[in-house]
Amino acid sequence: MAAYKLVLIRHGESTWNLENRFSGWYDADLSPAGHEEAKRGGQALRDAGYEFDICFTSVQKRAIRTLWTVLDAIDQMWLPVVRTWRLNERHYGGLTGLNKAETAAKHGEAQVKIWRRSYDVPPPPMEPDHPFYSNISKDRRYADLTEDQLPSCESLKDTIARALPFWNEEIVPQIKEGKRVLIAAHGNSLRGIVKHLEGLSEEAIMELNLPTGIPMVYELDKNLKPIKPMQFLGDEETVRKAMEAVAAQGKAKK
């Protein structure tokens, strides 16, 4: 018997996803298709009768707008929302803004896969002369971060290391109080939560593709261990196509 339910949703397609660029901490907005994905995700939650008590998201507009769109669809826009940089996407460092297919053609698909999918290998750092350095590192939303906290690049391991303290200290107590929690975030910060919940190996989490805009439901026991595999809310074809699209992103165009 499930003691708790947790719902995760990865933001819908962003303008930079559409252009196949490494987004990281760049604040790309949702594309029109991404907005529709978020709407469909919200409608799936509405159709299944979901209600929530508190929501968590990043400080990046593609996740925030996904959350807004979902809350609008389920008519729960009044819910409290906690935003934190700790749920941000992985910081892609010097790769930020580069087209993934062009990067694969230049560095080889194997190297791009290492940067995108290896557990503890970070991409090259974002140097001060990077075109998006000031846009990200000098943004006032990060003014309270210490030098140690503000990354110039992150591996998946680094991303999980800054997301999990927030999970443990802020989200877990809410779940254990019986609050119904919705988290709208990014592929890599959500991977960290999934890895932690399911006890996945580093290899397994690298291969996990979370679809965009599709609600993912966990039923958890009193120790916050899943009692069954993650469930997707959406028809099977939608889920399969979304996961295949995510897996194809780092491949060079033929």
Curated annotation (Swiss-Prot):
GO terms for cellular component: cytosol. Its EC number is 5.4.2.11, 5.4.2.4. Substrate binds at residues 10-17, 23-24, 62, 89-92, 100, 116-117, 187-188. The keyword Amino-acid biosynthesis does not apply. PROSITE patterns: PG_MUTASE (PS00175). The modification N6-succinyllysine is found at residue 251. The modification N6-acetyllysine is found at residues 106, 251, 253-254. Acetylated at Lys-253, Lys-253 and Lys-254 under high glucose condition. Acetylation increases catalytic activity. Under glucose restriction SIRT1 levels dramatically increase and it deacetylates the enzyme. It is an enzyme of class 5 (isomerase). Keywords: Acetylation, Glycolysis, Hydrolase, Isomerase, Phosphoprotein. The record marks 186 as: Transition state stabilizer. It catalyses: (2R)-2-phosphoglycerate = (2R)-3-phosphoglycerate; (2R)-3-phospho-glyceroyl phosphate = (2R)-2,3-bisphosphoglycerate + H(+). The modification Phosphoserine is found at residues 14, 23, 31, 118. GO terms for biological process: canonical glycolysis; gluconeogenesis. The active site is at 11 (tele-phosphohistidine intermediate), 89 (proton donor/acceptor). The modification Phosphotyrosine is found at residue 26. GO terms for molecular function: bisphosphoglycerate mutase activity; hydrolase activity; phosphoglycerate mutase activity; protein kinase binding. InterPro entries: His_Pase_superF_clade-1, His_PPase_superfam, PG/BPGM_mutase_AS, Phosphogly_mut1. Belongs to the phosphoglycerate mutase family. BPG-dependent PGAM subfamily. Catalyzes the interconversion of 2-phosphoglycerate and 3-phosphoglyceratea crucial step in glycolysis, by using 2,3-bisphosphoglycerate. Also catalyzes the interconversion of (2R)-2,3-bisphosphoglycerate and (2R)-3-phospho-glyceroyl phosphate. Homodimer. NCBIfam families: pgm_1, PRK14115.1. This is Phosphoglycerate mutase 1.
